[in-house]
Amino acid sequence: MADQSNNMIIEEVNKGLNPGTIVLLVVATLLILFFVGNYALYMYAQKTLPPRKKKPVSKKKLKREKLKQGVSAPGE
């Protein structure tokens, strides 16, 4: 008799999914969808958007770089 009552309790606990498991599955699914969506958007943007233009380098920076290399800047 004691064995049957213990088995019934265990079976009742195992019926259905644990609420914690459901929450974990939902959160994991949302995270995976988020990352897959981000990756898809990134790949789409790489194909369709034109490449970014580089910022123009200031004359002051050019002068400094040339002085570092040992080449005299023009106009000096």
Curated annotation (Swiss-Prot):
A GO term, aspect molecular function: DNA binding
Entry GO CC: nucleus
Compositional bias segments (type: Basic residues): 52-66
Motif (Nuclear localization signal): 50-55
Matching InterPro entries: S1FA_DNA-bd (IPR006779)
GO terms under biological process: regulation of DNA-templated transcription
Keyword Secreted: no
Region (Disordered): 52-76
Protein family membership: Belongs to the S1FA transcription factor family.
Main function: DNA-binding protein that specifically recognizes a negative element (S1F) within the RPS1 promoter.
Protein name from the UniProt record: DNA-binding protein S1FA1
Lineage of producing organism: Eukaryota, Viridiplantae, Streptophyta, Embryophyta, Tracheophyta
